[in-house]
Amino acid sequence: MTEDAEKRRYWLMKAEGEPRYVKGINVAFTFEMLEEITEDGKMESWSGVRNYEARNMIRDEIKIGDYAFLYCSNCKFPHIKGVMRICSNSHPDDSAWNSNDPYYDPKSTPQNPRWYSVGVQSEYKLDRPVTLRELKMHKENQLKSMELLNRSRLSISRVKPEEWKFIHELSKQPEPEEIIKARLQEEEKVAKRKRKLNLSDGENKAKSPYSSISENDASLDIIKRSRIKDVRSQKDNAL
C-alpha cells in the first residue's frame, strides 16, 4: 500500500438519482453523468451542499486523494453505483453566488463565502449497484456504526475503511433475492401505471371530435373555430 493510500479517507456523497427541477433546472446527478463529464480528465465541482455539518467536512476534512461513494438518493431504490476520487482541496462554492442557480444563497458572497465545494472525478464503478435496502440488512453487524444508516439526513458522511471494504465485497456477490423481487414488483407497478395512463389517454382521444384528424389538417382549425362560434351563439341566445 502506498503512503497516499494509507492516508486516504473514505466518504459517501449523496446526489439525486432521478429528475427533480428547481428553477427549471434538473438537479439530478448520476455516476454515468460524472463519467461522461470527467472522461477526458476534467474535474466536476461537487457543489450545492447547503448543510453546515456537511460543509464543514468539505472545508476541513476532505482532501485530495480521498475516495467517495457516489450515492443516488431521491429514487425508489437509493444505491451506491461507483467511486469518485477527490481531485482538489476545498474552495468556495460559487454556485451560491449565482441568482439563477438552484442552490443560490444571497447570504454567501465572494468576500464572505458561506459554502464550499471540492473537485471530483469518476474512479470506477462497483461490480453492481448496492442498494440502501441491502446495506440495512447488515445494520446489526458489519455496518452497525455506518453514518449513512444512523444519520441518514446528512448529504455527506464518513465511511470507515472496514465498511468501505465490506461494501465492495457485497458488490461482488449476487444481489439478495428479496431485493430483486422488490425491484421487479416496483417495475411492474410502474408498468401498470403507464399502461393505465396510455389507456386513459387513448380513451380521451377517442372521445375527441378531432381524434381522426391530423394536426396538420387545415379542416381542424375550421372545426375548432366552428365550435367556438357555436358556443358564442348559445351564450347570445341565453341573453
From Swiss-Prot:
Query: How far does the signal peptide extend, from start to end residue?
Result: none
* GO cellular component labels: nucleus
List the SUPFAM superfamilies hit by this protein, alphabetically.
Answer: PUA domain-like (SSF88697)
Location of the protein in the cell: Nucleus
The ranges of region (Disordered) come to 193-214
Main location as per UniProt: nucleus
Its keywords, alphabetically, are:
Nucleus
The entry's protein name is Uncharacterized protein C21.03c
